[in-house]
Amino acid sequence: MSAAASPRSLTLIGAGLAGCLLAILLSRRGWQITLYERRGDPRIKGYESGRSINLALAERGRHALRQAGAEDAVMAKAVMMRGRMIHPVSGEPQLQRYGRDDSEVIWSIHRAALNVTLLDLAEQAGARVHFYRRLHTVDFDAGYARFIDDRDDQPHEIHFQALVGSDGAGSALRAAMQRKAPVGEHIAFLDHSYKELEIPPRADGGFRIERNALHIWPRGRYMCIALPNDGGTFTVTLFLPNEGMPSFATTRSGDEALALFARDFPDALPLIPQLKEHWEEHPPGLLGTLTRERWHLDGRAVLLGDAAHAMVPFHGQGMNCAFEDCVALAEQLDAHSDLSEAFAAFEAARRDDAAAIQQMALENYLEMRDRVGDAQFLLQRALEQQLQARWPTRFVPHYTMVTFLRTRYAIALARSEIQREILLEATHGHTDLSRIDWVALETVVHARLEPLEGAH
């Protein structure tokens, strides 16, 4: 940093997951970091997120946590998931592994537990956190921001050098930037929404169903999933269309929800004793993809994570992508003394990757709800595993690139599209792998796929 900009300080709007991780990374680099959070301290008040979709922690997120010295504290609260446990309407559940063995797994962690852990570590690193501070107005030219304490409507004004928006999909900083200069915002909502329920632990505190899996009840246009928590519970999320049959329009009451589960999720129904009550208490949550043409305002403000590029949750990468953002922004702040240059370089480095994972998250929804029980999909999965075993540095499964490696999302998307074409062509007209032309496939794989860095 230049002497004119000293001391190095940033003001972060939002003390959620990304805000706290960025605070740790920058505080450890000597920055003076202050966070402003509109909600109360979750360690005192209890968690107020309004959404408790469990988070899937992958290698990208773990790498970012390692950079911040936070991995051990977080992993102590995480539960391993080996793969998708597919529950048909009738018959036994079947596990579809994510990777080759237990070195290739993902981890489930409850949002509240993770937030509290990172909040503690941010304060320990030297960051200052102010709660009950809702961003109200920003004078970017003068460097002043006004916050409101919603408990008493009292205003609080601060002077800032630069603002970082880590305040989620409904970002107040993004709205302030939009008022200053349009950021080209576009929101595309899915025609589906979600509602959350819970599977409690057994009387002895154990898990009622297999703990080391992400459970999926795929039913075509809709589905139910359940992720484990370290206390023996599962967070259940039902994704339904907004209209049609069945939908949230036709399933309004708790009794209608009971009938839906009895018909379409019969093995899940007895696991959710409070289904009726929770259905009527919890409103449906919206699902959407958020894009904008610009993430920063000169050197005065920058957005990251959901504030910049919110996505649907079906690839389990929203948090992982946001954590990558934090590392990328910290690296650009190391490389550039001028904040405007750092913010511009950060956006340039991350824009294509954010767009790629947003697209892949939408595609993964179709796979999870429509295809995981499809015979042709399972045949392609079997061939994919064979191709990876034969040429592991060239044919790297989509899920491996996104989840177990840190391959750039844009590269993972491009390679996945090529690999999907190879799988479709090779399995066309086949019901098993007995007549696959391996010699021809070797030629195609070597011609179309270069070795991928990090694959093994």
From Swiss-Prot:
It catalyses: L-kynurenine + NADPH + O2 + H(+) = 3-hydroxy-L-kynurenine + NADP(+) + H2O. GO terms for molecular function: FAD binding; kynurenine 3-monooxygenase activity. GO terms for biological process: anthranilate metabolic process; kynurenine metabolic process; L-tryptophan catabolic process; NAD biosynthetic process; quinolinate biosynthetic process. SUPFAM superfamilies: FAD/NAD(P)-binding domain. Its EC number is 1.14.13.9. InterPro entries: FAD-bd, FAD/NAD-bd_sf, Kynurenine_monooxygenase. Catalyzes the hydroxylation of L-kynurenine (L-Kyn) to form 3-hydroxy-L-kynurenine (L-3OHKyn). Required for synthesis of quinolinic acid. This is Kynurenine 3-monooxygenase. It comes from Xanthomonas campestris pv. campestris (strain ATCC 33913 / DSM 3586 / NCPPB 528 / LMG 568 / P 25). The gene is kmo.
